[in-house]
Amino acid sequence: DGTSYKSSFFNFSSMSGIDYLKEILNNKAYWSVWSKFHKRELLLNDPMEIYPNICFGEDVIWSVQLLLRSKKVVSIEYVILDYNIRNLSLSHSCNFDEGKFANFEFYRSWLELYLAQKGVIDFMKKDLAFFHIRNTFQKIVWRKIRNLKKDMDRIIQDLRCFPELKQSMSKRELRVVSAFRFSMLWGNLRLKYYIQKG
């Protein structure tokens, strides 16, 4: 709509690639491959897993692989680009069709499988729990309510392990989770009420 605003600023000097990935999972840094400079050898030394049919979430797949190969990520102190978000952009929520949702579900499952294969998933359980909570409620915003029992069961379990994550959730989100903890039926009724309420 032509409105300009500054993105959130993530202030750091340097950190490991895996630590930067954890910051992304915690919504403090960005997935976008194009907003970073990458050493050429990160792409050339080992083959990358590439999924040419993915049009939504390809940054996740590339960033995870590049960051796990990166010994160090360094920040620069000045703005290097402007990002224009258009109404017809691929990631705009009003254009979120079934194909993009399939991509969304794919990269979520790919991410955890890849981290497990690389032997680093145990270092990132809390970060992945936060990522899963945010993605589950994003699905609800998009009205793509599938596999909800599985998603809510995982959130309930994750909140037992990491109760501090409740601080990142809204009162409404906590009420929804509490309703699902009581029963699937009550959870669905509560969720339907909030969706209708807007």
Predicted regions and their residues:
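Donor-binding/catalytic cores of nucleotide-activated saccharide
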Residues: 1-74, 81-99
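Residues that form generic nucleotide/phosphate-binding pockets
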Residues: 23-24, 114, 158, 192
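A structural signal for short, well-ordered beta-strand segments and their strand-loop junctions
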Residues: 74-76, 124-125
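Catalytic core of nucleotide-sugar-dependent glycosyltransferases
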Residues: 78-87, 93-120, 139-142, 146-163
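Structural signature of alpha-solenoid helical repeat junctions
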Residues: 120, 124-128
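Amphipathic alpha-helical repeat scaffolds of TPR domains
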Residues: 127-139
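Membrane-interface aromatic/basic loop that binds lipid-linked glycans or pyrophosphate carriers
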Residues: 142-198
